[in-house]
């Protein structure tokens, strides 16, 4: 469709590389360890979602081929998978810079707050595994429009939150990253909406 072609064109035009963000502008040593662990925890919460997104959209990308979807749909789902891989990488780079360790679950906390935050993060990762099991079972059963109607509110919320975070952030590297992610999520929302508008009128509600 013309709408999805527009989304694909913007995805190509707006592609970004997390490694090219201005990481050198961030002085993590200016923060206390409690602050560093708290900020890293925020990125860890985000990574619970963003680390699950690449395989989620990769499974949907494969389904577009199985369902013989038109070319624009397939390319759009590829673009979402690629975007979400960037978001996961952004989370990992932020966590590594803040903690000096690449994995928040095996990191040795330096404060009591850090220990409590890590305990909660481990529980969230466990729940994330349960979500993946449920999603894998749902992919063969439902159409793309039904599957991704459940993602629509998340994409709307993400686009809004990241634009607000970019506007209020004082760290240039995070500000730029938030701006890119918010723009990506806006495109993902447009893809969900386009599929729903195309397919919902044809669905049997019985």
Indicate residue ranges for each PLM-predicted region.
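Non-heme di-metal
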Residues: 1-206
């Amino acid at each position: 469709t013309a709408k999805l072609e527009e989304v694909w064109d913007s995805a190509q035009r707006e592609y970004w590389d997390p490694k090219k963000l201005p990481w050198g502008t961030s002085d993590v040593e200016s923060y206390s360890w409690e602050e560093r662990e708290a900020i890293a925890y925020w990125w860890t919460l985000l990574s619970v979602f963003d680390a699950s997104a690449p395989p989620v959209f990769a499974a949907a990308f494969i389904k577009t081929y199985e369902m013989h979807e038109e070319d624009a749909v397939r390319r759009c789902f590829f673009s979402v998978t690629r975007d979400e891989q960037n978001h996961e990488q952004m989370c990992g780079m932020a966590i590594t810079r803040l903690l000096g360790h690449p994995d928040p679950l095996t990191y040795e906390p330096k404060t009591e707050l850090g220990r409590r935050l890590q305990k909660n993060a481990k529980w969230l990762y466990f729940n994330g595994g349960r979500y993946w099991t449920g999603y894998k079972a749902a992919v063969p059963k439902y159409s793309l429009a039904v599957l991704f109607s459940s993602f629509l509110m998340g994409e709307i919320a993400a686009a809004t939150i990241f634009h607000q975070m970019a506007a209020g952030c004082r760290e240039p590297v995070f500000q730029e990253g938030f701006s890119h992610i918010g723009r990506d999520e806006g495109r993902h929302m447009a893809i969900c909406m386009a599929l729903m508008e195309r397919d919902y009128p044809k669905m049997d509600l019985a």
